[in-house]
Structures are given as structure tokens and as C-alpha cells.
Amino acid sequence: MTCQAFASSDNFVPLNSDSSPSLPLIMHHSAAECLPVSNHATSVVSTVPSVLSLIQTPKCSHLHFAMMTSGNVSAGLHYSVPSCHYGNQTSTYGVMTGIKPATPEMLSASLSQSRILQTCSMPHPNVVNGVSTLQSKSFSFSCSLTPCLYKFPEHALSASSCALGHSFTPMHQTLLSDDPTAADFKQEFRRKSKSVEEPVDMDSPEIRELEKFANEFKLRRIKLGYTQTNVGEALAAVHGSEFSQTTICRFENSQLSFKNACKLKSILSKWLEEAEQVGALYNEKVGVNERKRKRRTTISIAAKEALERHFGEQSKPSSQEIMRMAEGLNLEKEVVRVWFCNRRQREKRVKTSLHQNAFSSIIKEHHECR
């Protein structure tokens, strides 16, 4: 690989690579305008005078790369490079375009590679001696040297060797900070959630009251004759399907959270009051029915024989006769009256059966005679 010189006054600085032979970088500058480049293109200038010389209006600079293989000169790669700004002055760096014009395919390839390499480029700090002095004089130093866009044989490109440093103005801190209103809202939300999630003391009066109510509720529920399933179905019919037998069981065993137990306590206490009122009304109705219905009276054998004798004499005694018999047998008048009624019904059934038997026997004899 060789370098073609354009003039005797031209100066060149080799652009070295770790994995490839050196590629000459030919720049048309005077001695004061020479821009040395390191092997990875990470340094811009090494002295302040050379930087100050860049502020002046430089001559048009060109780069030219050529390769020599087997004694023949290959076609040179020529393309233009975007300009680099130094303050208010402009200086154009690029490959020499006077020998051969760049083809459209080469330009499109260079543009696509430049976009890829620009995204992969790494920021480089200012390494120029005395840059702080220039910055204090309000000089804006922002330079981007266009990298080698074509991959030569045995020449590997890297992000560090194809990009120079960039100087960007840092974003103001107020733009990066969050909205104060949103921050206050977040702090308020965290404070409320923290207060809700704080654990409850197990020895607090609220916990003891919940445990006491759970035990009382269980005893009163059993006394009323309701099961946990009955309570869950009754509550689900009114408040929705969130109540079930499992919920009632966990409440009675104090296995619910403090918040859910407090919510369920008010609902169960109201249901318990209504259930006790319904139970009281039911007991009153049952008591009235029990008073109307008397228990069965047992009559001794001697009393039954005396009543049979009176029934043989008079099957339908009067009220006075029933009273005298009740006083003589030490029975209630209503008991004697009911006994005579039952005895007459039984006598009637016996006579009916006798008549039916007699009639059936007569019919049978009649059929036999035929």
C-alpha cells in the first residue's frame, strides 16, 4: 500500500490500525496547519498552537487512499465528507475528488455505513492541552471527523478508530427532575399505603373484641339451629357471592385479616339480630300450638271397664251423666266425653263390617243355589 503525493509541500501522517498495515492520510495543509492523528483517532491535537491554527481559515483539505497490489494501482476511493465547525469558521475534510468521481453505489454505501458507525461511536473527552482556556473564551469546540467508510482488505474498523469525540451541552437538571406535584402525590400515596399495611397489635382492644364477638356469634348461631352454610347462603343472597361457608368458618376461627374481620363483624351482628327476632316469633307460634294441643291421656283398666258398662247401658249419655261419671272415675269431663265419642265410632265400624260380612255370605249362598 502506498501513498500518492500531490505536491512536494504536502505533509502526511500515517493512520495506523492494530490489525492492518498503515494507511496514509494525506492532508493539504501548511506546516502550521498540520493535524496529527493517533492510531485510533482519539486525539485531535496535541498543542494549543496547533488548535489555534485551526481557528484560522484553513485551506481546502483532501484525503486520498490508494492501494498497490501486485505492482498495479487499484482504483482510488473518493468521496466528500461533511464539514467540521470550529466556532464561526468552517473547515472541510474529505477524500480528494479531483481524480475520480464517486459512483452512486459508493455514496449510498458510505451513507449507510456512516449511520451505523455514528450510532456505535463513543464520546471522547477533550484531550487538547489548554482546551479550558479556549472554552473560557467562549469558543465552542465540536468536531466529528468522518470515519473510513469502506472496509479495506485486512483493515478492520472499530468504533474507537472511526470516531472522534463529541462535545454536547448537558441537559438542564430541572428538565430531568420529576414534576413536584407528581412527587407529592407519590409521597402521599406511599404514606397512606404504609399506614394501611402497618401490622395490628394482637393484644389491642380491637382484636380482643373481635375474638369475643366471634365466640359469641358461634354459640348463638348453634343455639338458633343455623349452620355455617345457612349463614353464608343468607348473606350471599343479600350482599353477593363473596360470603360462603368458608368465610364464616374463618371468621369464627379468627383466621381473617383485621380489615376483613371488622367489615364482616357489622354484617354478622346485623344478621344475628334479625335471626334472633325470627327465632323468637317462631317460638311464640310453636308455644301457641302446644297450648292448643293436649298430650295424650292414659286411662286405667278399671276406668275402661266402668266406661264400657255405662256404654252398654247408654251409648249417648247426656252432659250431666258424663260429669257424674268423670267425678266418680276421677277423670276430666272432656276425657270421658271423647272416650264415648271414640267408642261409638268403633261400634259403628264393627256393625258395618258385620253387615258387610252377612250380606256377602247371603250373596254367596244365593250363587251356590243356582
From Swiss-Prot:
Pfam family, one: Pou
Residue ranges for the DNA-binding region feature of this UniProt entry: 292-351
GO process terms (BP): positive regulation of transcription by RNA polymerase II
Protein keywords: Activator, DNA-binding, Homeobox, Nucleus, Transcription, Transcription regulation
One of the record's GO cellular component terms: nucleus
InterPro entries named in the record: HD (IPR001356), Homeobox_CS (IPR017970), Homeodomain-like_sf (IPR009057), Lambda_DNA-bd_dom_sf (IPR010982), POU (IPR013847), POU_dom (IPR000327), POU_domain_TF (IPR050255)
Annotated POU-specific domain residues: 202-276
Tissue: Pituitary gland.
Location in the cell: Nucleus
Coiled coil: none
Chief subcellular location: nucleus
Sequence motif 9aaTAD, residues: 5-13
GO molecular function, one term: RNA polymerase II cis-regulatory region sequence-specific DNA binding
Region forming the signal peptide: none
Family: Belongs to the POU transcription factor family. Class-1 subfamily.
Biological role stated in the UniProt entry: Transcription factor that activates growth hormone and prolactin genes. Specifically binds to the consensus sequence 5'-TAAAT-3'.
Comment on protein domains: The 9aaTAD motif is a transactivation domain present in a large number of yeast and animal transcription factors.
Name this protein carries in UniProt: Pituitary-specific positive transcription factor 1
Protein's gene: POU1F1
